Amino acid sequence: MINDVISPEFDENGRAMRRIRSFVRRQGRLTKGQQHALDNYWPVMGVEYQAEPVDITALFGRDAPTVLEIGFGMGASLVTMAGHNPQQNFLGIEVHSPGVGACLADATEAELSNLRVMCHDAVEVLENMIPDGSLDMVQLFFPDPWHKARHNKRRIVQTPFVELVRRKLKVGGVFHMATDWQPYAEHMLEVMNGISGYRNLSSDNDYVPRPDSRPLTKFELRGQRLGHGVWDLMFERKE
């Protein structure tokens, strides 16, 4: 497993260039189980980053609808979705290796063959590896809201990013976002409404009820008991 989650970029003078990232990589300690999964299951389900388009049909060994999830955390929801939808391919991206290890362990225990995982910056993966018009759905669940105003520029949902996602979706493909931070939900809606190539699937042109396709997490259930809200947004590529 190659553990460089970002690729260095240099200017014409050879100086390293800084790109605003939507994540801070806090490298937590791996449990023995997570390390075992990385050592043994990454060769089966792991996908190394490459700066050229990947053949998705070859990657999964079949031609099937493909779902990309960005930032899957510990992977519980992703594994559940892959298990419930064996007719679909699932590609998950996460920059924190403990989460990748946990996901690999759970996916192996569930005997999943339709799941692949990556440990790299999702923006670079989308820019360089994912062919245009190849994805049926892109999922972005509970991304870091970067609460402080001075950090808002770090939010992954910005106009260039959602335009990039649109290019990677098939016509009719869906970009599904969810957040438990209302100001971020409002920001997401504002950004999406500014892009002409999407159609909001909400009948009220704002948020949709949580679809059955997105499993409830323990964190979300706890939040519901405390009266916390969750906002789902689903936008379809229309052109």
UniProtKB/Swiss-Prot annotation:
Q: State the species of origin.
A: Serratia proteamaculans (strain 568)
InterPro entries hit by this protein? SAM-dependent_MTases_sf, tRNA_(Gua-N-7)_MeTrfase_Trmb, tRNA_methyltr_TrmB_bact
Q: Which residues form a coiled coil?
A: none
Under which name does UniProt file this protein? tRNA (guanine-N(7)-)-methyltransferase
- Highest taxon of the source? Bacteria
Q: Which UniProt keywords apply?
A: Methyltransferase, S-adenosyl-L-methionine, Transferase, tRNA processing
Looking at the keywords, is S-adenosyl-L-methionine present?
yes
> What gene does the UniProt entry assign to this protein?
trmB
Species lineage: Bacteria, Pseudomonadati, Pseudomonadota, Gammaproteobacteria, Enterobacterales
Matches recorded under PANTHER family? 3-DEOXY-D-MANNO-OCTULOSONIC-ACID TRANSFERASE/TRNA GUANINE-N 7 - -METHYLTRANSFERASE, PENTACOTRIPEPTIDE-REPEAT REGION OF PRORP DOMAIN-CONTAINING PROTEIN
